């Protein structure tokens, strides 16, 4: 490190915050690669008496630097809180596990008794969980109360490793007469899916002391939701349940409602964008009506809830004296339904708790496709049953053919809206309209476009116009989820759209990328374009796109330059950003 760099580092460290047993290097943007780089940080740690909290967020720590920092921590037995989120920016994923192992060993050697461990926004993936697995199983974590692992990309494998480590920690600590009493668990945006969530649910059942669980955006469907619900039932101290942007459907919502009936301490419920639908909302309303006396906030926004179900939810709030917010935005109440909802709450003197209904869909518009929606709901509920019976059907089919019968597409009956008579239809719901999807994109609508969705979207888009291609790309990528079926549908649509565009001689690739950066808020523009709010989907779609043969490699340096620049919107999607950066470095 050059002498001027050392002087700059020393100046930065001089501004280090020290308060109440806490040593903070938060947001200093320190690049600690070698032992020499970390020399002054180590001195600060060594000279700090009674160190209880160490903040390393917003810096980047390499393997060698982590090793010497860990050595300094070996003498800090009073350390209780490790705020170590976002401290591996720009590191290869292979660097992170050994760095975490070293830091963990330092804490174990010190005999620390941790209360809080925050490793959020470190894109370490499943392998990274192995980096702190030994720490979680050690006596240093027998006293752990808060574990925060938001946006780490753990995946199913990482979720299982984490669950096993927590279970082992509880077993070992119980043997010493002081069972692990974890209170706060945060693991949003980790691609846990059903298997990862189910494994963690088993650990939660063993622990039984949880007060807050935050697991939004994990691609969890009703089997995983049901497992979590059963685990929550044996955690009677739960106050906050945040499962935003997973997929409950009616089955998951009903299971969760049964658990809510048994809990008395719940204050905050966030099931927004969870597709609980009307029947699920009614079940939750019934659970709330009979309990949850301390409820302060309920979020059921964007859940495809209709008017009557929404009114049932509102009516369940009658005796909730502590209620501060009820969010039913983005459902299908219609103008009249919104007015009725407000009237119900006004009758309870609770009008002020109702969140905005600005994104509500008109009920009349919804009724036009009501039969199609109901059919889709029935189909989704039958999916699991069909999967379970698939093997039996495959065994029966050869026998039927042997009897001279032709294989046919399974059909079922629904009522004809005009005659009221049963009308045979294919078991799959009618495909959604491409223009409807592009106007109001959602994962469900994309899947309902069917196997030709990618071709249809590409055909619908004028690929000679970069602005229109940007618009289509952002709408498709906005519905990206880590759930396998949605992820593949998004990637296929992106491939069809962008291959058609980039292969066109009239398409201006540079203009496309420039306009894309503008719409993502990464490049300023004179036309004052409103940047999209969430970059996770577009970043994940870009990560896929830049690896394809059709992508002009000459665009990679420009994209890399803008994704590398500091940006608050990018920082909130650190896993997706880190993954894209790793890919771009290889292009």
UniProtKB/Swiss-Prot annotation:
Q: Where is this cross-link: Glycyl lysine isopeptide (Lys-Gly) (interchain with G-Cter in SUMO2)?
A: 8, 15, 279, 452, 524, 586
Where are the Phosphoserine residues found in this chain? Answer: 24, 301, 358, 428, 435, 442
N-acetylalanine modification sites are: 2
Listed Polar residues bias regions: 400-410
Q: Write down the position(s) of the site called Hydrophobic interaction with UBE2I.
A: 562, 565
Gene3D superfamilies in alphabetical order: Ran-GTPase activating protein 1, C-terminal domain, Ribonuclease Inhibitor
Q: Which Pfam families match?
A: LRR_6, RanGAP1_C
CDD domains, alphabetically? LRR_RI (cd00116)
Which residues get modified to Phosphothreonine?
A: 409, 436
What positions does the record give for the motif labelled SUMO conjugation? 523-526
Q: Cross-referenced SMART domains, in alphabetical order?
A: LRR_RI
Q: Where is the composition biased (Acidic residues)?
A: 358-397
* Covalent link location (Glycyl lysine isopeptide (Lys-Gly) (interchain with G-Cter in SUMO1)): 8, 524
The post-translation modification note in this UniProt entry reads: Phosphorylation occurs before nuclear envelope breakdown and continues throughout mitosis. Phosphorylated by the M-phase kinase cyclin B/Cdk1, in vitro. Differential timimg of dephosphorylation occurs during phases of mitosis. The phosphorylated form remains associated with RANBP2/NUP358 and the SUMO E2-conjugating enzyme, UBE2I, on nuclear pore complex (NPC) diassembly and during mitosis. Sumoylated. Sumoylation is necessary for targeting to the nuclear envelope (NE), and for association with mitotic spindles and kinetochores during mitosis. Also required for interaction with RANBP2 and is mediated by UBE2I. Desumoylated by HINT1.
What tissues harbor this protein? Highly expressed in brain, thymus and testis.
* PTM annotation (N6-acetyllysine): residues: 524
User: What are the protein's GO molecular function terms?
Assistant: cadherin binding; GTPase activator activity; RNA binding; small GTPase binding; ubiquitin protein ligase binding
GO terms in the biological process aspect are: activation of GTPase activity; cellular response to vasopressin; negative regulation of protein export from nucleus; nuclear export; protein sumoylation; response to axon injury; signal transduction
UniProt similarity note: Belongs to the RNA1 family.
Function as written in the Swiss-Prot or TrEMBL entry? GTPase activator for RAN. Converts cytoplasmic GTP-bound RAN to GDP-bound RAN, which is essential for RAN-mediated nuclear import and export. Mediates dissociation of cargo from nuclear export complexes containing XPO1, RAN and RANBP2 after nuclear export.
Subunit structure, per the record?
A: Homodimer. Interacts with RAN. Forms a complex with RANBP2/NUP358, NXF1 and NXT1. Forms a tight complex in association with RANBP2/NUP358 and UBE2I/UBC9, the ubiquitin-conjugating enzyme E2. Interacts with UBE2I; the interaction conjugates SUMO1 to RANGAP1, and subsequently stabilizes interactions of sumoylated RANGAP1 with RANBP2/NUP358. The complex composed of RANBP2, SUMO1, RANGAP1 and UBE2I associates with nuclear pore complexes. Identified in a complex composed of RAN, RANBP2, sumoylated RANGAP1, UBE2I and XPO1. Identified in a complex composed of RAN, RANGAP1 and RANBP1.
Q: What is this protein called?
A: Ran GTPase-activating protein 1
Q: Record the organism.
A: Homo sapiens (Human)
> Gene behind this chain?
RANGAP1
């Amino acid at each position: 490190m050059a002498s001027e760099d050392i002087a700059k580092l020393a100046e930065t460290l001089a501004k280090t915050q020290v308060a109440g047993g806490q040593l903070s290097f938060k947001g200093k943007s320190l690049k600690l690669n070698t032992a020499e780089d970390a020399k002054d940080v180590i001195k600060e740690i060594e000279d700090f008496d009674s160190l209880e909290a160490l903040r390393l967020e917003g810096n980047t720590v390499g393997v060698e630097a982590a090793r010497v920092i860990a050595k300094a921590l070996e003498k800090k037995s009073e350390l209780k809180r490790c705020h170590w989120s976002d401290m591996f920016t720009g590191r290869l994923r292979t660097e992170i596990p050994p760095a975490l192992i070293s830091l963990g060993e330092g804490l174990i050697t010190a005999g620390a008794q941790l209360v809080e461990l925050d490793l959020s926004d470190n894109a370490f993936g499943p392998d990274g969980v192995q980096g702190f697995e030994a720490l979680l199983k050690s006596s240093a974590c027998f006293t752990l109360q808060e574990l925060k692992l938001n946006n780490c990309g753990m995946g199913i494998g990482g979720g299982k490793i984490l669950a096993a480590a927590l279970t082992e920690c509880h077993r070992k600590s119980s043997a010493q007469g002081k069972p692990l009493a974890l209170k706060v668990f945060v693991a949003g945006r980790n691609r846990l899916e059903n298997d990862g969530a189910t494994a963690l649910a088993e650990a939660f059942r063993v622990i039984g002391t949880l007060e807050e669980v935050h697991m939004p955006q994990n691609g969890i469907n009703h089997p995983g939701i049901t497992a979590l619900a059963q685990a929550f039932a044996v955690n009677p101290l739960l106050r906050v349940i945040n499962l935003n942007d997973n997929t409950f459907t009616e089955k998951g919502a009903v299971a969760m409602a049964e658990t809510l009936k048994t809990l008395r301490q719940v204050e905050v419920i966030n099931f927004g964008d969870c597709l609980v639908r009307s029947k699920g909302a009614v079940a939750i309303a019934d659970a709330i009506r009979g309990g949850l006396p301390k409820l302060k906030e309920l979020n059921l926004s964007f859940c495809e809830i209709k008017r009557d179900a929404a009114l049932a939810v509102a009516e369940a709030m009658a005796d909730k004296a502590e209620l501060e917010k009820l969010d039913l935005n983005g459902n299908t109440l219609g103008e009249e339904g919104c007015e009725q909802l407000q009237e119900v709450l006004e009758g309870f003197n609770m009008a002020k708790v109702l969140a905005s209904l600005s994104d509500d869909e008109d009920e009349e518009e919804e009724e036009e496709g009501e039969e199609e929606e109901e059919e889709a709901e029935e189909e989704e509920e039958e999916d699991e049953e069909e999967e379970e019976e698939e093997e039996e059907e495959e065994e029966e089919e050869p026998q039927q053919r042997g009897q001279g019968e032709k294989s046919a597409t399974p059909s079922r009956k629904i009522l004809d809206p005009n005659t009221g008579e049963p009308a045979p239809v294919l078991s799959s719901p009618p495909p959604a309209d491409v223009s409807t999807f592009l106007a109001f994109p959602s994962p469900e609508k994309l899947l309902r476009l069917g196997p030709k969705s990618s071709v249809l979207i590409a055909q619908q888009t004028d690929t000679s116009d970069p602005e229109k291609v940007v618009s289509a790309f952002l709408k498709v990528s906005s519905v990206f989820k880590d759930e396998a079926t949605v992820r593949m549908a998004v990637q296929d649509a992106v491939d069809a759209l962008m291959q058609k565009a980039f292969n066109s001689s009239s398409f201006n690739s540079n203009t496309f990328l420039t306009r894309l950066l503008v719409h993502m808020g990464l490049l300023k523009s004179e036309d004052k374009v409103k940047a999209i709010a969430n970059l996770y989907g577009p970043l994940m779609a870009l990560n896929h796109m830049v690896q394809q043969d059709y992508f002009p490699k000459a665009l990679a340096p420009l994209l890399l330059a803008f994704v590398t620049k500091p940006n608050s919107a990018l920082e909130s999607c650190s896993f997706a950003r880190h993954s894209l950066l790793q890919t771009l470095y290889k292009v």
